[in-house]
Amino acid sequence: GTVPCGESCVFIPCITGIAGCSCKNKVCYID
């Protein structure tokens, strides 16, 4: 998880998770 997906995951999971993004430090990242 090094590239931010432009989405936060403080209250809800990453919607961009369908694109391979994961939550890290309250922000969604993708490798």
UniProtKB/Swiss-Prot annotation:
Q: Name one Pfam family in it.
A: Cyclotide
Show the cross-link location (Cyclopeptide (Gly-Asp)).
1-31
Q: Name one GO biological process term.
A: defense response
Keywords for this entry? Disulfide bond, Knottin, Plant defense
InterPro entries hit by this protein: Cyclotide, Cyclotide_bracelet_CS, Cyclotide_sf
Superkingdom of source: Eukaryota
Q: How is it modified after translation?
A: Contains 3 disulfide bonds.
Q: Which PROSITE patterns match?
A: CYCLOTIDE, CYCLOTIDE_BRACELET
Q: List the disulfide bonds.
A: 5-21, 9-23, 14-28
Q: What is known of its domains?
A: The presence of a 'disulfide through disulfide knot' structurally defines this protein as a knottin.
> What job does the chain carry out?
Probably participates in a plant defense mechanism.
Q: Which family does it belong to?
A: Belongs to the cyclotide family. Bracelet subfamily.
Name-wise, this protein is Cyclotide cter-J
What phylogenetic lineage does the species belong to? Eukaryota, Viridiplantae, Streptophyta, Embryophyta, Tracheophyta
